[in-house]
């Protein structure tokens, strides 16, 4: 469809409207509960309330999808469906506000659905133990955070670092510095991980009632809270010093046997360094990776699970501990994440710093980098050569078409480097591929409005043909007078010429070109490529016809040719017998002879080009028989199917290269914009030929050539600018009809689905809760009009809404029966809106709704 659509003048017919009803195999379960829509009905500004609505809706949606996935009576994974209140299912919600002083902040919301695996009937008390386990962790965290808040308010001190630990074992809290304790945490975590501990959770005292789930005797539970406060020089708006606060909460395993730790069957002292030179590289790497993963998992996972567990209760709970936890988390959310990342990166830096001293590890990294670098060497050289080529060779302004010979020279120039070295062959190939892409992009720029692609292609074809023709003439020594002649077409009019040859052996029947066997219309390929090829042939035949006439064309013959040249995609312009070729007079001056010779050059060029590319076949006419045949009857050529264009591969002579080039141009796929430019250029060519005729076209047409004769479709404005304002009524009408026929045919072909593919259904489902009935009806009518303009056969509406579909169904049936167009429907809608606005301005009430009014007045 054209980019510029005149909706009010569109002549496209309206489509039908139907109610979408799914088949038996497609049950329709489109339901939206009122509770789910409450978010849209009640525009609350409280983010916590909105998030609680969203959580409930997600829970219901997830439960609904699970019910659909497992139908009643079926088993899911070999077990019966659990009820909605099963404690093994749970939703974890995490949302916090990052609002800070001086910035609006952002609200973060995360939700995850978790289903615990079924553990059998022997673990009935696991849910209770799990609640106590997380409650114990939560209590420790809340107590530590509340203690921090109280101490902060009482003391008011700053620049302090507090390290609080809750020990569940028998050992007293060690009196050590914070950095030493942090380093020991990492060392002990790596040591504990290497002992293949079976449990993945840290059970506290009283966490598990079952004896099988008790913790090993050599492990104890440790909960650590680290609080940092850093004072900055700036002062806040309330004259209080601003401080950055962060806390770090961690729960890890600790070994009771702090003195010894068995590893790999050996006994090593616990105070040994984690990285020893005598350790094997594989054990060293495995212990490092396990330590990092255990450290990150114990810090991040345990803390976030505790937070999400708490926030699940916080939606409906208003206890003091929950409120304090909420305030603390929202206040310190950024500091928590920042401190976690900082701590992890510091430990990772220490690990990598030690790894860089290991020669085996460094050599492995170097080998890996070298392997990846060698694989990317071709791409790197490709980019370098492409850049070098663009700097050296691509400085000229891009042309639409380049010479094929120029392309091959550029490729060989760059690819000759290092041809003898077998290692550089793939690099040369990559550079050639890169150049091909660059040249392809350069050779197909966006066509400028003042010069279309077809005009540039025609100029290039004429220049190439003249060059080849002069080379052949110079070799044979036939025409020496044309060596210094200009390669431009004279602009002034030619005098009428008598009927004998133009200075070269020519027979009138040669103009018609070898006659092809006409094919049936259903065998032709009606696509954009065939349209473009036929338009090119039409343009070339029009130029050839004008050259043969010598500037004196019969007006009636031109009108017949213009009216029938482009109405069908597989036929060329009509060439009547009355408008056959004419010849120059004998004894003309040298200037006229030179012009006639130049005209003969162009004529022979186009004739040979068409015969060797478009009309070439096995049963073409013999040249000798053509010369001997003096029959005046000349039939118009018929363009063959585009599938026969491959027969031009065996051409010879001076036009072999030109034939191959034009065939390659015609065989490429052309887009819709290219076809539009072709049609525009052919129409302009017809007008130029019409204006250059000696006989005025005004004698055949009427005096009315205003805007009323223009069709109402999207016709190019440039073509209207070429049309004369005086005395070209008939020519303008015929050209417009021809262009309109092509435009309509292309639209009808593009709207049809491919063979063997059913057209997809277009289904519209509108959900407007707070809108008025008037706006709903207007929206449905505009959707119907847009679907009609896009050639949608039937528009389906799903879900009845206040009887709008029934009225629209009746309206569409009446409009299709009356033959109404899209423009007429839109004009009626505008009329109704104007009347409604006038009634509202006066104070009257509109009696009829939009659909009812259209039923009466459309």
Swiss-Prot record:
The keyword Aminoacyl-tRNA synthetase does not apply. InterPro entries: AKAP_110 (IPR020799), AKAP_110_C (IPR018292), SPHK1-interactor_AKAP_110 (IPR008382). Residues 131-144 are annotated as: PKA-RII subunit binding domain. Keywords: Cell projection, Cilium, Cytoplasmic vesicle, Flagellum, Phosphoprotein. The modification Phosphoserine is found at residues 215, 410, 641. The modification Phosphotyrosine is found at residue 411. One of its GO terms (cellular component) is sperm principal piece. Residues 191-244, 570-590, 620-644 are annotated as: Disordered. Residues 226-242, 620-630 have a biased composition (Basic and acidic residues). One of its GO terms (biological process) is establishment of protein localization. The keyword Manganese does not apply. GO terms for molecular function: protein kinase A binding. Phosphorylated by STK33 during sperm flagella assembly. Phosphorylated on tyrosine. It is found in: Cytoplasmic vesicle, Secretory vesicle, Acrosome; Cell projection, Cilium, Flagellum. Structural component of sperm fibrous sheath. Required for the formation of the subcellular structure of the sperm flagellum, sperm motility and male fertility. RII-binding site, predicted to form an amphipathic helix, could participate in protein-protein interactions with a complementary surface on the R-subunit dimer. Belongs to the AKAP110 family. Interacts with ROPN1 and ROPN1L. Interacts with QRICH2. This is A-kinase anchor protein 3. It comes from Bos taurus (Bovine). The lineage of its organism: Eukaryota, Metazoa, Chordata, Craniata, Vertebrata.
């Amino acid at each position: 469809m054209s980019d510029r659509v005149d909706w009010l003048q569109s002549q496209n017919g309206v489509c039908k409207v139907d109610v979408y009803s799914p088949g038996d195999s497609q049950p329709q379960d489109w339901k939206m509960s009122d509770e789910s829509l409450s978010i849209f009905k009640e525009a609350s500004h409280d983010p916590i309330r909105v998030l609680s609505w969203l959580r409930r809706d997600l829970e219901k949606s997830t439960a609904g999808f699970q019910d659909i996935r497992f139908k009643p009576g079926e088993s899911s994974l070999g077990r019966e469906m659990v009820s909605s209140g099963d404690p093994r299912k749970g939703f974890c919600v995490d949302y916090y506000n990052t609002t800070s002083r001086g910035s609006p902040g952002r609200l973060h919301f995360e939700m995850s659905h978790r289903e615990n695996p079924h553990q059998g009937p022997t673990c009935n008390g696991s849910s209770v133990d799990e609640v106590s386990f997380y409650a114990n962790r939560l209590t420790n965290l809340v107590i530590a955070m509340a203690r921090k808040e109280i101490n902060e308010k009482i003391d008011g001190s700053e620049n302090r670092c507090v390290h609080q630990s809750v020990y569940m074992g028998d050992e007293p809290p060690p009196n050590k510095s914070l950095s030493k304790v942090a380093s020991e945490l990492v060392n002990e975590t790596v040591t504990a991980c290497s002992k293949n501990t079976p449990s993945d959770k840290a059970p506290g005292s009283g966490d598990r009632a079952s004896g099988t789930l008790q913790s090993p005797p050599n492990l104890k539970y440790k909960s650590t809270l680290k609080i940092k406060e850093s004072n900055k020089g700036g002062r806040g708006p309330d004259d209080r010093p601003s401080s950055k606060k962060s806390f770090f909460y961690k729960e890890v395993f600790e070994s009771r046997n702090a003195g010894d730790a068995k590893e790999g069957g050996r006994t090593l002292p616990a105070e040994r360094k984690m990285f020893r030179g005598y350790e094997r590289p594989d054990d060293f790497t495995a212990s490092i990776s396990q330590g990092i993963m255990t450290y990150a998992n114990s810090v991040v996972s345990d803390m976030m699970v505790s937070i999400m567990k708490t926030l699940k209760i916080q939606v409906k709970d208003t206890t003091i501990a929950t409120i304090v936890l909420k305030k603390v988390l929202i206040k310190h959310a950024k500091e928590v994440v920042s401190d976690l990342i900082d701590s992890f990166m510091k430990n990772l830096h220490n690990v990598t710093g030690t790894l860089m001293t290991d020669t085996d590890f460094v050599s492995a990294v170097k080998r890996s980098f070298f392997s990846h670098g060698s694989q990317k060497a071709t791409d790197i050289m490709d980019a370098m050569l492409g850049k070098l080529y663009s700097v050296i060779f691509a400085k000229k302004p891009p042309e639409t078409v380049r010479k094929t010979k120029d392309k091959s020279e550029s490729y060989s120039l760059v690819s000759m480097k290092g041809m003898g070295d077998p290692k550089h062959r793939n690099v040369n190939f990559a550079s050639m591929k890169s150049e091909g892409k660059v040249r392809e992009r350069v050779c197909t720029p966006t066509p400028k409005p003042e010069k279309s692609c077809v005009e540039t292609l025609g100029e290039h074809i004429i220049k190439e043909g003249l060059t080849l023709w002069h080379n052949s003439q110079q070799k044979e020594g036939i025409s020496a007078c044309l060596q210094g002649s200009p390669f431009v077409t004279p602009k002034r009019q030619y005098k009428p010429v008598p009927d004998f040859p133009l200075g070269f052996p020519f027979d009138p029947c040669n103009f018609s070109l070898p006659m092809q066997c006409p094919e049936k219309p259903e065998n032709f390929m009606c696509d954009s490529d065939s349209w473009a090829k036929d338009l090119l042939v039409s343009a070339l035949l029009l130029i050839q016809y004008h050259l043969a006439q010598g500037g004196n064309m019969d007006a009636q013959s031109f009108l017949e040719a213009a009216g029938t040249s482009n109405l069908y995609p597989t036929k060329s312009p009509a060439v009547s017998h009355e408008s056959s070729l004419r010849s120059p007079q004998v004894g003309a001056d040298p200037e006229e002879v030179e012009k006639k010779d130049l005209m003969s050059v162009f004529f022979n060029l186009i004739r040979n080009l068409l015969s060797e590319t478009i009309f070439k076949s096995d049963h073409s006419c013999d040249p000798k028989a053509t010369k001997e045949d003096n029959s005046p009857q000349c039939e118009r050529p018929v363009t063959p199917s585009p599938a026969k264009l491959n027969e031009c591969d065996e051409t010879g002579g001076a036009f072999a290269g030109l034939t191959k080039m034009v065939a390659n141009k015609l065989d490429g796929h052309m887009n819709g914009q290219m076809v539009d430019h072709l049609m525009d250029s052919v129409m302009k060519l017809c007008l130029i030929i019409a204006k250059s005729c000696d006989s005025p076209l005004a004698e055949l047409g009427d005096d009315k050539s205003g805007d009323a004769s223009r069709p109402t479709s999207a016709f190019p404005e440039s073509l209207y600018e070429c049309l004369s304002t005086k005395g070209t009524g008939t020519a303008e009408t015929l050209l417009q009809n021809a262009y309109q026929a092509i435009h309509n045919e292309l639209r009808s072909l593009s709207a049809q689905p491919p063979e063997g593919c059913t057209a997809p259904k277009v289904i519209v489902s509108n959900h407007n809760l707070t809108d008025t009935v008037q706006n709903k009806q207007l929206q449905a009518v505009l959707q119907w009009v847009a679907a009609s303009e896009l050639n949608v056969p039937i528009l389906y509406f799903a879900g009845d809404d206040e009887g709008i579909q029934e009225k629209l169904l009746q309206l569409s049936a009446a409009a299709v029966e009356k033959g109404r167009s899209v423009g007429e429907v839109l004009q009626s809608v505008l009329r109704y809106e104007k009347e409604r606005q006038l009634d509202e301005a006066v104070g009257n009430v509109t009696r009829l709704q939009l659909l009812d009014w259209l039923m009466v007045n459309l």
